[in-house]
């Protein structure tokens, strides 16, 4: 076996060698890197700031239902993990519906602003990514495992907004509040 015959075998072994090592930053743990969530929070804040002074084209011709982002820290700490997961999962689903509805309303506006459309598109993409990351973390399984008969399983609190700036404020607050609290605790448990 000459040197040329060994080259393909050597190259193949170099390609397969890394497969024996655990992947750092695998998707299930990616949400545990604080920089990942901080990036989504920054995008949400930028969208919120961009729409704060906006009057023209930022109001909706209908109300959009969004999750309540207020957190009672005393109650949150005493909540079962499954209840926290359910609240975050339902809130994320409702927020995704709201952003998608806002996107549709913006697309149907007479003169949609391209910058606003870009922020909404980023929010849609960000929420899809966050949903995937939470699914990999096990939030959906924890939320589903909560028995329906549990008395602590209160319905998700929600209200309506009528402007893009309010929608982005809710988006930003949800990421900084309930989502950050849940992912922080889920990552600390380390059993994922």
UniProtKB/Swiss-Prot annotation:
SUPFAM superfamilies: 4-helical cytokines. One of its GO terms (biological process) is hemoglobin biosynthetic process. Gene3D superfamilies: 1.20.1250.10. Glycans are attached at residues 49, 63, 108. Disulfide bonds join 32-187, 54-58. One of its GO terms (cellular component) is extracellular space. Produced by kidney or liver of adult mammals and by liver of fetal or neonatal mammals. It is found in: Secreted. Belongs to the EPO/TPO family. Hormone involved in the regulation of erythrocyte proliferation and differentiation and the maintenance of a physiological level of circulating erythrocyte mass. Binds to EPOR leading to EPOR dimerization and JAK2 activation thereby activating specific downstream effectors, including STAT1 and STAT3. This is Erythropoietin. It comes from Bos taurus (Bovine).
């Amino acid at each position: 076996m000459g040197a040329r015959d060994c080259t393909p075998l050597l190259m193949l072994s170099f390609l397969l060698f890394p497969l024996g090592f655990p992947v750092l930053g695998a998707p299930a743990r990616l949400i545990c890197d604080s920089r990942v969530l901080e990036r989504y929070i920054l995008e949400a804040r930028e969208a919120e700031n961009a729409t704060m002074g906006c009057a023209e084209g930022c109001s909706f011709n209908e109300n959009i239902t969004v999750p309540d982002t207020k957190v009672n820290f005393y109650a949150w700490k005493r909540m079962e993990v499954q209840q926290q997961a359910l609240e975050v999962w339902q809130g994320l689903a409702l927020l995704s519906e709201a952003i998608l509805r806002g996107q549709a309303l913006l697309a149907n506006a007479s003169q949609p602003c391209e910058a606003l459309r870009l922020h909404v598109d980023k929010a849609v993409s960000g929420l899809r990514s966050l949903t995937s990351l939470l699914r990999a973390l096990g939030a959906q399984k924890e939320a589903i495992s909560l028995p329906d008969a549990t008395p602590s399983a209160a319905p998700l609190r929600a209200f309506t907004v009528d402007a893009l700036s309010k929608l982005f404020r809710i988006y930003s607050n949800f990421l900084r509040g309930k989502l950050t609290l849940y992912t922080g605790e889920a990552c600390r448990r380390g059993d994922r």
